[in-house]
Amino acid sequence: MYKRLFISRVILIFALILVISTPNVLAESQPDPMPDDLHKSSEFTGTMGNMKYLYDDHYVSATKVKSVDKFLAHDLIYNISDKKLKNYDKVKTELLNEDLAKKYKDEVVDVYGSNYYVNCYFSSKDNVGKVTGGKTCMYGGITKHEGNHFDNGNLQNVLVRVYENKRNTISFEVQTDKKSVTAQELDIKARNFLINKKNLYEFNSSPYETGYIKFIENNGNTFWYDMMPAPGDKFDQSKYLMMYNDNKTVDSKSVKIEVHLTTKNG
């Protein structure tokens, strides 16, 4: 009897160790923010147009490119030209760490991301706080090209549900040609829609007090980005876009997106 009890306890202890040591969905999931966790547009006294610029048709987009250089160990430089405004012909994307940069260094990739100019450095000779001519910077936004596109140029629709003051007021879809797509690409497309349809960002302010965009993956994991700038009178585009440096990707067929907004009079 004692032997059987001992064996049962050993099995129980082993099972507990296995549960503790095995990553689980809830542990990896980012909980929804509390109201005090979010930036408030009323506490930002700068120009909201600087935020709007990041999501209003000024993004970097390129297919089948390969890095040609780097500045630091955790970034990659590509020959990508601005076909619309002719503002740049080189793009540097900064990643979370050196390992992530090495992963894509010699790969043929697609690049899609929001870019900035001030505090964009390609070498130690670039002037601090100045715009480097012909060059622009971004974070993340990389996906491997080979095998990551749908057949016959098909596109995948991704559902976005918008909640204003906790009420679902509008739903729409954004499209991507990628099987594995960066959250940044979907975020840009969702916010661009909301700028055009809901005036998400205006020149001086926003009709919304708080906002966050939430991604729900097929395994139940969730994560979100704050959609408003930090309090103060200045908006640092580089610092804000840094949230994309982990190059987070999602499965375009299964991911769901929610946008949660509160109005200033709500």
Curated annotation (Swiss-Prot):
Transmembrane segments: none annotated. One of its GO terms (cellular component) is extracellular region. The keyword Secreted applies. Residues 1-27 form the signal peptide. It is found in: Secreted. Pfam families: Stap_Strp_tox_C (PF02876), Stap_Strp_toxin (PF01123). The keyword DNA-binding does not apply. It comes from the Bacteria. Disulfide bonds join C120-C137. Zn(2+) binds at D36, D110, H145, H149. One of its GO terms (molecular function) is metal ion binding. Keywords: Disulfide bond, Enterotoxin, Metal-binding, Secreted, Signal, Superantigen, Toxin, Virulence, Zinc. InterPro entries: Enterotoxin, Staph/Strept_toxin_CS, Staph_tox_OB, SuperAg_toxin_C, Superantigen_bac, Toxin_b-grasp_Staph/Strep, Toxin_bac. Staphylococcal enterotoxin that activates the host immune system by binding as unprocessed molecules to major histocompatibility (MHC) complex class II and T-cell receptor (TCR) molecules. In turn, this ternary complex activates a large number of T-lymphocytes initiating a systemic release of pro-inflammatory cytokines. Also causes the intoxication staphylococcal food poisoning syndrome. Interacts with MHC class II molecules composed of alpha/HLA-DRA and beta/HLA-DRB1 chains. Interacts with host T-cell receptor/TCR beta variable chain TRBV8-2. Belongs to the staphylococcal/streptococcal toxin family. This is Enterotoxin type C-3. It comes from Staphylococcus aureus. The gene is entC3.
